Curated annotation (Swiss-Prot):
It is a multi-pass membrane protein. GO terms for cellular component: mitochondrial inner membrane; respiratory chain complex III. CDD domains: cytochrome_b_C, Cytochrome_b_N. The chain crosses the membrane at residues 33-53, 77-98, 113-133, 178-198, 226-246, 288-308, 320-340, 347-367. Pfam families: Cytochrom_B_C (PF00032), Cytochrome_B (PF00033). Binds 2 heme b groups non-covalently. It comes from Thrichomys pachyurus (Paraguayan punare). Heme b b562 binds at residues 83, 182. Heme 1 (or BL or b562) is low-potential and absorbs at about 562 nm, and heme 2 (or BH or b566) is high-potential and absorbs at about 566 nm. This is Cytochrome b. Keywords: Electron transport, Heme, Iron, Membrane, Metal-binding, Mitochondrion, Mitochondrion inner membrane, Respiratory chain, Transmembrane, Transmembrane helix, Transport, Ubiquinone. Heme b b566 binds at residues 97, 196. A ubiquinone binds at residue 201. Its cofactor is heme b.
């Protein structure tokens, strides 16, 4: 195998990426999420492909085709719920992966980081369009509310919304195009992942210490392949437990009611992984302001390399910054909770406070704390 690994043009690329790749000797389990995201993407493409074989992207039959998949197709229920819960796992790993990047200062690899943010937007768009496809109440009203936000764009807004809808409301044309985009986007994501890895391999991996690891590297295989397989097995355990024991735990019961344009659900909300951004959107009374805050809540990630004021890369030896990061995590959990609550007191004011603190922690508190830590270390 070694004889073939080095000279073969295709296997050589795989060899340099996954076998003989020099990796830092001290990377922790927080570095497992990249490979887990790759597995999730593959799983989503495979299950999605089988679902697409039986799904019909038509308003009259979409809901019943999903029911047909669950009832009549061999293991259709398993494929459907593995796909739905696989998306939840995907986002859990994405948020862990981003959190790890922030904690250990991995954002200083700016090219890799920026491609990662583009990937996040692409995955979010894919998940949103996928949520529309079962054509339940929450699918329909979620699509209506979120696409309608674009009407806040000055001058071109209303025309843009109608152009996306393919008519004057969310209807057959909208569903068909959402299915087309939902099908093609994962392949675009796969291409972006390749670029993400390409940029990463230009610099090599970061490590928990934040120091240059070139003096102490080990081959990726067998050390990290075994470690990744352990992560994979744990992921499958969680995913299968979720899929087989409580497949609807993270879903919305309203989506088991067929879409009805004449009946608005009492509380329209997206899937749990978008609730933090949805809470930020709702906490601003102005429509355009809300949309800008929503977009900026994700785009703010691009500012991390610029806002890094510390003389150290990682937060490993910076307890004050660590406290702030965990405060940010707690804040995001509060935002997620608020996003799922009705728009009434006290949830409105809690959401507004959490939104203000989200932006102020990132834009003001983290950079100033880093400067203070530099002073404390007499740097």
């Amino acid at each position: 195998m070694t004889g073939m690994r080095x000279p073969h043009p295709l296997i050589k690329i795989i060899n340099h990426s996954f076998i003989d790749l020099p990796a830092p000797s001290n990377i922790s389990a927080w570095w497992n999420f990249g490979s887990l995201l790759g597995v999730c993407l593959a799983l989503q493409i495979i299950t999605g492909l089988f679902l697409a074989m039986h799904y019909t992207a038509d308003t009259t039959t979409a809901f019943s085709s999903v029911t047909h998949i669950c009832r009549d197709v061999n293991y259709g229920w398993l494929i459907r719920y593995a796909h739905a819960n696989g998306a939840s796992m995907f986002f859990i790993f994405l948020y862990f992966h981003i959190g790890r990047g922030i904690y250990y200062g991995s954002y200083s690899f700016t090219e890799t980081w920026n491609i990662g943010i583009i990937l996040l937007f692409a995955v979010m768009a894919t998940a949103f369009m996928g949520y529309v496809l079962p054509w339940g109440q929450m699918s329909f009203w979620g699509a209506t509310v979120i696409t309608n936000l674009l009407s806040a764009i000055p001058y071109i807004g209303p025309s843009l919304v109608e152009w996306i809808w393919g008519g004057f409301s969310v209807d057959k044309a909208t569903l068909t195009r959402f299915f087309a985009f939902h099908f093609i986007l994962p392949f675009i994501i796969t291409a972006l992942v390749t670029i993400h890895l390409l940029f990463l391999h230009e610099t090599g991996s970061n490590n928990p210490s934040g120091l240059n690891p070139n003096s102490d590297k080990i081959p990726f295989h067998p050390y990290y392949t075994i470690k990744d397989i352990l992560g994979l097995l744990l992921m499958l355990l969680v995913l299968l437990s979720l899929t087989l024991f409580s497949p609807d735990l993270l879903g919305d019961p309203d989506n088991y009611t067929p879409a009805n344009p004449l009946n608005t659900p009492p509380h329209i909300k997206p899937e749990w992984y978008f609730l933090f951004a949805y809470a930020i959107l709702r906490s601003i009374p102005n429509k355009l302001g809300g949309v800008l805050a929503l977009v900026f809540s994700i785009l703010i990630l691009t500012l991390f390399p610029t806002l890094h004021t510390s003389k150290q890369r990682s937060m490993t030896f910076r307890p004050l910054s660590q406290c702030l990061l965990w405060l940010l995590v707690a804040n995001l959990i509060i935002l997620t909770w608020i996003g799922g609550q009705p728009v009434e007191s006290p949830f409105i004011s809690i959401g507004q406070l959490a939104s203000i603190s989200y932006f102020s922690i990132i834009l003001i508190l983290m950079p100033t704390t880093s400067l203070m830590e530099n002073k404390l270390l007499k740097w």
